From Swiss-Prot:
Name of this chain's protein: Adenylosuccinate synthetase
Keywords from the UniProt entry: Cytoplasm, GTP-binding, Ligase, Magnesium, Metal-binding, Nucleotide-binding, Purine biosynthesis
Residues binding GTP: 13-19, 41-43, 306, 332-334, 415-417
InterPro entries tied to this protein: Adenylosuccin_syn_GTP-bd, Adenylosuccin_syn_Lys_AS, Adenylosuccinate_synth_dom1, Adenylosuccinate_synth_dom2, Adenylosuccinate_synth_dom3, Adenylosuccinate_synthetase, P-loop_NTPase
Note on cofactor: Binds 1 Mg(2+) ion per subunit.
Length: 432
C-alpha cells in the first residue's frame, strides 16, 4: 500500500512548506490542501524561477500529479481564477490537474469587507489578519448560512441564498461598522461569470482519495499557516480560523484518520511571526535585523515584514505533541551562517519566577514570559546549497542534533536554499 504523508508548519507559518511539498511530490500522485484559504503563501523556486501559490496546491507544477482543494478550504473564486490564469499563461494545464470539493465554502466580496471593517474597528487590538475574508467565511460555514461550491449547480437557488445572506451582512456593515454596503448584483454577476469553470472541477474528494489509497497511490496533504496559529491549539485569539494541525487532515479532506502514515513538521532554524500575538523569543536588536535581512522575511501573501527571533523549542514541542510528528524538515539553516553564537529556547521563566517547559493555551498566559536559552557556537562557513550532512560545518550539525534532543523528533530533511535541489533527504517520508 502507498504511504500518505502530511506536511505542515510547526511554528507561526512561513516555515517553507511549499518548497518541501513540491520536492516530495516527485513521488506523490495526489496533493491535497485541507484547510485555510488564499491567506497562505507558498513560494517555490524551480531552476531559479519563482512561483508563489496562495490557494492551489504546490503539486500543480508537476504534470503527473493531481491537485485537490478539500472541503476544509475556504475558496475565493476571484483568487482562484487569478492564480489559474497566472499558471495557465505559463503553460500549466491547471484545469486538467486541479479538482475541488463541492463542500468548499465560498469567500465572496462581503466577507472581505467584513474582515477589513472588523480589523479597523479593533484598532490597537487588531489581530493582524490578511484582510482576505477568511475568518468571516469560516464563520458563515459554522453558522450554516455559508454558500458552497456545490450551490453553483443550481444558479437560481444560489442567487436566492446569496440575497438572503448579503442582506444580513450588509446590515452589519452599514449599521454596526458604519461601512459601505456590498453590491448584490455585482457579487452575483462576478460569481455567475465563472460558475461553470468551478463546477467543472468538482469531484467527490473523499471517494477519490479512498480509491487512490486502495490502489496504493502516494498522497500528500499540504498544510497552510502553522501549528501555533491553529484555531483551537494556537495562541488564541491571535490565530487563524481553521485547524492547521494534523487533525484537520481528516475533517478537511474526508480521508479517514487511520490512513495518515507520516507527519512531517516543517521547522525553520529560527522563528518568525506575522501580525500580532505572543512571541517569547522575538528579537529587537541587530540579530533580529540580521535574520530578517538574510532570510528575506517578508510575507508572500501580504508583503508585511515578519517578526524574527530564536528558535523556540518549547513551542515546537507543543507542535510535536499535537501533530504526533514523525520527523522534522529544518529549513533556512543557511540564514544562521555567520553568527558567532546561536541560541535555542528550551524553557520559559514565568512572572512568578517558576520555570516551565510547556506553552500556555491562551494569549494572556504568555504575558511576562521570559525565554530561557541554551547558547551554542555559531559557524562562519556557508551552509547554502550544501547537499550532504557531512558537508555542513560541525557547529551546524551540533545545532541540528540539539534540536532533535530537546524535541525528541529526528530531523529527516534539511533545506539549505530556496531551490528544490538545495535539499538533503536523510529519511524519505514515503519510505519511513
Amino acid at each position: 500500500m502507498g504511504k500518505n504523508v502530511v506536511v505542515l508548519g510547526t511554528q507561526w507559518g512561513d516555515e517553507g512548506k511549499g518548497k518541501i511539498v513540491d520536492l516530495l511530490t516527485e513521488r506523490a500522485k495526489y496533493v491535497v490542501r485541507y484547510q485555510g484559504g488564499h491567506n497562505a503563501g507558498h513560494t517555490l523556486v524551480i531552476n531559479g524561477e519563482k512561483t508563489v501559490l496562495h490557494l492551489i496546491p504546490s503539486g500543480i507544477l508537476r504534470e503527473n500529479v493531481t491537485s485537490i482543494i478539500g472541503n476544509g478550504v475556504v475558496l475565493s473564486p476571484a483568487a482562484l481564477m487569478k492564480e489559474m490564469k497566472g499558471l495557465e499563461d505559463r503553460g500549466f494545464p491547471v484545469r486538467e490537474r486541479l479538482f475541488i470539493s463541492e463542500a468548499c465554502p465560498l469567500i465572496l466580496e462581503y466577507h472581505v469587507a467584513l474582515d477589513v471593517a472588523r480589523e479597523k474597528a479593533r484598532g490597537a487590538k487588531a489581530i493582524g489578519t490578511t484582510g482576505r475574508g477568511i475568518g468571516p467565511a469560516y464563520e458563515d460555514k459554522v453558522a450554516r448560512r455559508g454558500l458552497r461550491v456545490g450551490d453553483l449547480f443550481n444558479k437560481e437557488t444560489f442567487a436566492a441564498k446569496l440575497k438572503e445572506v448579503m442582506e444580513y451582512h450588509n446590515f452589519q456593515l452599514v449599521n454596526y461598522y458604519k461601512a459601505e454596503a456590498v453590491d448584490y448584483d455585482k457579487v452575483l454577476a462576478d460569481v455567475m461569470a465563472i460558475a461553470d469553470i468551478l463546477t467543472g472541477m468538482v469531484v467527490d474528494v473523499s471517494e477519490l482519495l479512498d480509491g487512490a489509497r486502495q490502489r496504493g497511490d502516494l498522497i500528500m496533504f499540504e498544510g497552510a499557516q502553522g501549528t501555533l496559529l491553529d484555531i483551537d491549539h494556537g495562541t488564541y485569539p491571535y490565530v487563524t480560523s481553521s485547524n492547521t494541525t494534523a487533525g484537520g487532515v481528516a475533517t478537511g479532506s474526508g480521508i479517514g484518520p487511520r490512513y495518515v502514515d507520516y507527519v512531517l513538521g516543517i521547522v525553520k532554524a529560527y522563528s518568525t511571526r506575522v501580525g500580532a500575538g505572543p512571541f517569547p523569543t522575538e528579537l529587537f536588536d541587530e540579530t533580529g535585523e540580521f535574520l530578517c535581512k538574510q532570510g528575506n522575511e517578508f510575507g508572500a501573501t501580504t508583503g508585511r515584514r515578519r517578526r524574527t527571533g530564536w528558535l523556540d523549542a518549547v513551542a515546537v514541542r507543543r507542535a510535536v505533541q499535537i501533530n504526533s510528528l514523525s520527523g522534522f524538515c529544518m529549513t533556512k539553516l543557511d540564514v544562521l551562517d555567520g553568527l558567532k553564537e546561536v541560541k535555542l529556547c528550551v524553557a520559559y521563566r514565568m512572572p512568578d519566577g517558576s520555570e516551565v517547559t510547556t506553552t500556555p493555551l491562551a494569549a494572556e498566559g504568555w504575558e511576562g514570559i521570559e525565554p530561557i536559552y541554551e547558547t551554542l557556537p555559531g559557524w562562519s562557513e556557508t551552509t547554502f546549497g550544501v547537499k550532504t550532512l557531512d558537508g555542513l560545518p560541525q557547529a551546524a550539525r551540533d545545532y541540528i542534533k540539539r534540536v532533535e534532543e530537546v524535541t525528541g523528533v529526528p530531523v529527516d530533511i534539511i533545506s539549505t536554499g530556496p531551490d528544490r535541489s538545495e535539499t538533503m533527504i536523510l529519511r524519505d517520508p514515503f519510505d519511513a
